Design a protein with these regions (language model features):
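Alpha-helix C-cap/termination motif
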Residues: 96-99, 127-128, 172
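Conserved adenine-binding aromatic site and its adjacent loop/helix in ATP-hydrolyzing domains
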Residues: 91, 123, 150
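Generic recognition of short, well-ordered alpha-helical segments
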Residues: 116-120, 147
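Structural recognition of the conserved hydrophobic beta-strand(s) that form the central parallel beta-sheet
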Residues: 104-108, 121, 132-138
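Conserved catalytic/switch belt of AAA+ P-loop NTPases
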Residues: 94, 119-130
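Charged, glycine-rich active-site and insertion segments that engage polyanionic ligands
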Residues: 1-22, 130-133, 139-173
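Clamp-loader machinery-focused feature within the broader ASCE/P-loop NTPase space
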Residues: 1-112, 116
Length: 173
């Protein structure tokens, strides 16, 4: 979707794909559970941990929530997606696309969105601006607030076979 504006120019498509693969495309945004830590003392949001996120996902695309929280040294707290995050999402998604095409917001482990965050995102998710896509990823769809679920199109993706995961991890070393 982030390459769709480059219909004819193969070099631009390759450039966009490289940015996507390195998770650095300026129109690809990620939100994930965080909390305060030694690095961030208050109002923690995903933007404070974006480098660690990219590194973690590139290293292990199958990372679990507990592995993620351990990676960012949040051990005695629950990771969550807070109202502060909703404010960041609203800011980011109100801007024009950097490269002139789609904007994509991936919310990983969306079931960790607190009620205040969900309520603040309702209108944006229901009526996103043109060429805006939200992907809410969850392991527990029943934990997502019904008001959010009702505004989304559900696509079930079965879990990846553990054998495939093991083979992929072995290949990576």
């Amino acid at each position: 979707i982030l390459c769709s504006k480059y219909k004819e120019n193969e070099l631009e498509i390759i450039g966009a794909q490289q940015k996507i693969n390195s998770l650095t495309h300026p129109d690809l945004h990620f939100v994930f559970p965080v909390n305060t830590s030694s690095k961030v003392k208050s109002k923690a949001t995903s933007k404070h941990f974006v480098k660690e996120w990219r590194d973690a996902i590139i290293e292990n695309p199958y990372i679990t929530l507990s592995q993620w929280l351990e990676k960012i040294e949040i051990t005695n707290k629950k990771g969550n997606i807070s109202v502060n995050e909703a404010e960041e999402i609203n800011k980011i998604m109100s801007l024009k696309s950097y490269e002139g095409g789609y904007k994509v917001m991936v919310i990983w482990m969306a079931e960790n969105m607190n009620t205040e965050c969900a309520n603040k995102l309702l209108k944006l998710i229901e009526e996103p601006s043109r060429e805006t896509v939200f992907l809410l990823l969850t392991e527990n769809k029943s934990a997502i607030l019904p008001t959010i679920k009702s505004r989304c199109q559900e696509i079930n993706i079965p879990p990846i076979d553990t054998k495939e995961i093991a083979e992929s991890l072995i290949k990576k070393g």
